[in-house]
């Protein structure tokens, strides 16, 4: 039986501002990435998200991003490798404290937004992220863009297990990277098209790019976004589609 992880970015509310559909999406995913206060989230939201994840027996990961609340961590920043190391270590350490306080164990780290995209093509940034994980806890998994040489090499250097990630509702460029969110065709808004893409990646090992080319993808985890208008319905639809196609959903081991 084919096995795949379904992950989702949660814990993105901040103070009085609610974001996402955390409670409704949790039943349909096997792992979550919790915002750690830099691009979204706050201490109370972090604690509450961890507790809810444990109630659903969902694997917990840290989702560190750039310190950019207004831009939601989706804007590139001109920072040094040392700054990236500090940002990541600080954030994953904070989430780990909440997980331990709740009696749980953190499973992975997945960079957020611009930090993720920059790391996928910038070896220095990917190296800084992997180094922070190694110093924090080398048994933590690193979720990174499938086929990214920067992520692959950084994980190998620090002896960290890389979980290669693909995206359900994002389009891909010819080089295998994600189409920038600044482009009109960055998101797949048709649910059936998104599910078709996911099944191609999981069952057949490739994705169709915006240029009409096929790119090989070894997807071990699929990211769902939890903040769209139909995010919950989409998550449930993918969950049920996997079940119908005899695809087992579980967190990486």
UniProtKB/Swiss-Prot annotation:
InterPro entries: Glyco_hydro/deAcase_b/a-brl, LamB/YcsF/PxpA-like. It is an enzyme of class 3 (hydrolase). Gene3D superfamilies: Glycoside hydrolase/deacetylase. Coiled coil: none annotated. Keywords: ATP-binding, Hydrolase, Nucleotide-binding. The keyword DNA repair does not apply. GO terms for biological process: carbohydrate metabolic process. It catalyses: 5-oxo-L-proline + ATP + 2 H2O = L-glutamate + ADP + phosphate + H(+). Forms a complex composed of PxpA, PxpB and PxpC. Belongs to the LamB/PxpA family. This is 5-oxoprolinase subunit A. The gene is pxpA.
